[in-house]
Structures are given as structure tokens and as C-alpha cells.
Amino acid sequence: METPKYKNALIVGAGEGLSASLARLFAREGIRVALAARSVEKLGALCAETKATAYACNATEPEEVERLFGMVEREIGTPDVVVYNASARARGPFLELVPADVAQAIAVSAFGGFLVAQQGAKRMLPLKHGAILFTGASASVKGYPQSAPFAMGKFALRGLAQSMARELSPQGIHVAHFVIDGGIRSRTRAEPADRPDSMLDPDAIALSYWNVLQQPRSAWSWELELRPWVEKF
């Protein structure tokens, strides 16, 4: 039973919260980290802390995603862990939704995931080694009122992950989708003082991602649900 070894991680849709927790955990484990976001200015402190390299990239643009992987490959090494964290929302009553906003939400949440995963898989398959992780949400499995675009994007991302897992797992690529069913606490989003542990801790989520990465291929998960102990489901 062999535990997988990873060298280079690329986190797309990076920012504070879960992405930062993942970057810190990967760095502690000796993995080189690349962070990608539309705006990299916000990533300066995290890069300094983790020795990560930041890249500006619009994940919905095929040329930019291809260029991103080329730069990461040259400057850090071929990513053998790719995490897709990007998502977008367009809220409002169904009849008031703006088509362009809906299209953008789906593009960021789902189409970007396809573009990033395709570039990652293209590099992993010749090596028969690698992992592609997708961050989902409650909306991956449940549609909520006035949140149709987010559900559309997250449902699509989950379908992408499931299809990829069935196709690529037999070729040595571990594909996993994480349903984050609850709010993630952050510097700007604290949990109620009278309800401890009622929100997801990003460090705890990152540890769950890491545990999935460490699974031997004889017992791979393709999906994991994470929620606080008080969350109803």
C-alpha cells in the first residue's frame, strides 16, 4: 500500500480562507505552491509566508489558462496537484436575473474548472500520477431560492468531477470533489459566540483535502461532504 507523493501544487481561484489554508498546509509538507487569481495583489502576504508564486489568470479564458500552466511548469515544475477553488454568484429573483451575469457565474464556477482540469490532466496522464480537486458547495447538490446561477455552476462542476473521476482514475489520476456544506469562517466572517464550531474552519477543510490526497489508490474517494456538526442536511 503506497501513499502518493506530490511535489508541485497549483491552486486556482486563490485568496484568503480555504486557498490560504491549503497553501500553508502544502508548504509545510514540502510541496512547492503556485497561486492563481484574477488579481494577485491580494496574495502578497500569503506568498511571503508560504514562498508561493502568484500568477494572474482569468480561468474562463482558454489561452490564459494554457499560458498559466506553461509558466508554472517552467518556473516551479509540472503541477501534480491542481485545486480549483474559483466560483461566482449572481443572486436575485429568477425573473430578474441578467443573462450576462448568469453566463459569467456559470463560466467561472464550471467552464473554468473544465479548462484548468484539462490542462492539468494533459500533463498528469503521461506520468500516470496526479490529483485534481474541485471545491463544491451546498449548491452542488441543492438548489436554493434566488441562487439559480450558483447552483447551475456548481451542479455542472460536480458533473465534471464525476465524469473525470470515472475516466481518469483508471489512468492513475485521483479526481475528487468536495461538497462544502456550510459557511466557512474567516477574518471578516466570524461564527456566533454562543455557537462554537458552527462554521467550517478552513484549516480543518484543508486537512480533509490533504487526507484525500494521501489515500492509497486501492481506496480512493471521488467525493467528500464536509459540514459543521450543527448543520442540518
Residue spans of the language-model regions?
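A short, exposed helix-loop element centered on a Lys and neighboring polar residues
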Residues: A117-Q118, Q162
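Active-site loop of short-chain dehydrogenase/reductase
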Residues: Y6-K7, T78-P79, P93, M124-A137, ...
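Substrate-binding pocket helix/loop in short-chain dehydrogenase/reductase
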Residues: P93-F94, D101-A103
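C-terminal helical subdomain
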Residues: P170-R185, E191-F233
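The beta1-alpha1 cofactor-binding region of Rossmann-like NAD(H)/NADP(H)-dependent oxidoreductases
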Residues: A56-R67, P99
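Conserved glycine-rich cofactor-binding loop
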Residues: G15-E16
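Catalytic loop of short-chain dehydrogenase/reductase
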Residues: A131-A156, A161-Q162, R166-S169, I184
